[in-house]
Structures are given as structure tokens and as C-alpha cells.
Amino acid sequence: MMSVKTGALVRCHPAMALVAAALLCSACVSTSTTPKTTEKPTAPPATSTQKPAAPARGGTTPAAGTEAAAAKVPTITAADGTKIAYEVSGTGPALLMLHGGGQSRKSWAERGYVDRLAKKFTVIRLDLRGSGDSGRPDTPAGYALDKVVADILAVADAAGAKRFHLYGFGHGATIGRYLAAQSDRVISAVLVGMEMGPAVSGPVKEALTSMRAKWQPMLEAQKAGTLDIKKLSPGDRDAWEHGVALSAIALGALLDYPPVQPADIKAPTLWLVGAADASGMENVKQFEGKLAGTKVTFKPLAGLSYTDSFARIDPVLADVEPFLASTAQPAS
């Protein structure tokens, strides 16, 4: 299910059809930061369960209740005015970490990743736009891939990292594959729980198209001052008040993201998928034969589901730490 609270894991393939239905009808509120579901995120998390403030015209809407928290952490300001929050911990080669859907930069620390990795790396964590303490654009263009990538590189600049290792989980890994394919600044990449090929396809693509078509006109009407919330159905009104409209816009941005093939990736990359992640492993079957001669090395995480591939830090880092050590370069 799609969570409308940050901190939960949400999945796209193949369960996005259920996610889309939930978003179209009402808000689905998560009550656990470690849900039993193994649904996979490939999209930014939904907004807070508090009623969102009216989106700024042509700008961004901060997450409800996060203004004070955002003031306590460093931020960069993107060219479109979106604030991107980040944190830096540890010393050593730079390691930039991209969180999964329904998560924030804090998720890495809560699971113990920062304590482990900051012993040998300068760990740089950010809230992707639409997440945590970062701003929330209210148009599809606000989540364009080039803007998301520019945010990440700007955070690396602010942290003093000319080049860096990359670690992404879920949606963060989906974004990370574009960086690994496009930027010479990536020394190496660890991509966990992501899929090669299109960002979205098939029923998922159809669901996202419907979601964006439903909610984008409402946001435009709100900005024009013509939206009458009272005229919405009870389900749509509840969903609106839970921030689903902005979530639909963020999710819909994936429709515009291009596919990535293993051969496109320029940096040495460790691709990890839980062996018990059925849809993830189905994707692996499609691409495993295309890895020869590329920079991508695939390893299954024995016995782990999608959720486990983030939650169970010890077996995951048993593969990650040796790979990072083998590709590590001095901090720069």
C-alpha cells in the first residue's frame, strides 16, 4: 500500500495497481515504520497525514509540521526554489545515500546504517524532493528527473564531495541508476531493490496516468481559487486532506523517466535484490543475461524479501561493505 506517512516502505511493481486504487479512493495511513508488506517503492513518499497548506503558486509546499525540523538541518536551494535538506556524518571517502519510497534521510540512521558506514565514510544523506524536510513541488515538472539529479549533485557540492560513492534503496536506487549512468562523479554505486529497464510500465504506467489525470486538475483549480472542496466525494475529500493530490503528482513524474539498461551504467555497480522478492527477481531474469561486459554485478540477497533488503542490515552490509572497500577512493 501507499503510505501517507513518511517512514513506511511502499512498493510499485507489481502492486502499484493496488496503490493507485487506494490513492484514487482515499488516503491509506501507515501505522508502522517497519510494515509486514514487501511492496516495493519506486516513487517519492506521500505527504503528511496533516491537512496540507495550499501549494504556493509555481513553487513548493513544505511538508506539514516539518518547518521547525527543516530549520535545524542544512539545506540547499534548487534553481526552482525547492529546499533540499541533508546531513553529513563521519569521515573518509564520500558516500551519498538515497532513501526509498515512504522514507527520508532519517531512515538510514534509524536502521543503523549511518553508525556502521560513518566509521569509514563521510556519509551524506538527503531528503529527496517531496520527502522528509525537503520541499514538495505541486506540478509534474517539479519532479522532473533532471531536477532530482541536480538536487543530489548540489548536495554533494555543499558537502564538499567532488566525487562520491552512491548507495540507493528502492526509489533511491531507481534514481541512483540515472546518476551512475550520467555522472562521472559517481565512483561506484550500490543499488538495492531496484529494477532495470523502464521506471514504470504496463498496468503500473496506466495506473499512474490515471492518478495524475485525476488530481492534477484539482491542484490547478486550487491555485486558481476555483476548487470547491465541499463538492468532492467523501473519499476524494479525505484523500485531498491527507495530501494524496501532491503524492499523485510526485508518483506521476515516473511516467516521464527514461529506461536504463545495464550497459548504460558507467560506474562499477553492485545490484542487490532480495532472493525472496518475487517481482524483483523476475526483473533480474530479464536482465541477468545482459550484464556480461557491463559495469554491473548482480548478487541475490539469500532469503531476503524486498523489505528485508533494507530492514536486515547485517546480511545486506555483508555484501555492501566489501564492495565499497574494493572501490573506495580518498575523500575529495
Language-model-detected regions and their locations in the chain:
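Active-site loop/oxyanion-hole signature of alpha/beta-hydrolase fold enzymes
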Residues: 125-164
